[in-house]
Amino acid sequence: MSSATPSDATPSDRACYVYGIVPADAPGPDEAAGADGFVGVGDPPEPVRRVRHGDVAALVSEIDPRRPLGTPQDLIGHARVLDAVAAGRTAVLPFRFGAVVRDPAAVTDELLAPQGERFRSALEELAGLAQFTVRGTYREEAVLREIVEQRPDIARLRAETAALPEDASRPQRIRLGELVSAELADRARAGADELLARLGPLAVATVRADPSADQPVGASFLVADDRWPEFTRATDELGADWAGRIDLRLLGPLAPYDFAARLVDAPGPRPWD
């Protein structure tokens, strides 16, 4: 969602990294995570604290602005802070990775003061909700075997191609690849449809993920706190139904990465209502 950039100011050896926005009276990330001295990005990473203004607060930690951001440890630290807050059942508006401002005063003056009301409204809508993301990957050999069994045209072309020298079978190989790719795309769409049909009723909002070669099926779900166990069980049941063909992975509770921007950028009724 929102991001912040360094202010035009005299360079300093310290700056504020901003993770996201929470209610001003929410527990800090160390309390939410049940661990003292909770840390985020940077080398070494500094403790995360809150900068409050009115009803909202920014989660920040100090960093050295001269050190480039973007290491795997930085990315993990950014998500770890936000997801710990979400797991503690605190509403949070996650910022994109890399939001940096000059100092705590700039956090207030440039971020919280001008946008505080929008942040407060969005946090109210996200209260009691967290994101769960479900990703599915194919068992490639099993799925290809199933395609050959269920598509006689593909099975015939595969047999014809195997019987020809490689140079002579190039057109057939290209056609075979096209047919298999199209069938995989159809199955990915059907899988995503079933995923949303099975799990969507347990969420207040859903976002279908764009399919990719390594993740053909996936979606994110905004789930009420009291339905987390039910959602987890339903995901396990779907995974059991798909066992041997598609491996499901459930991530969550997470900060609402796929939903927060729609609230802040589109004031008014919740986009999913």
Predicted segments, located by residue:
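An interfacial alpha-helical scaffold signature
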Residues: M1-D273
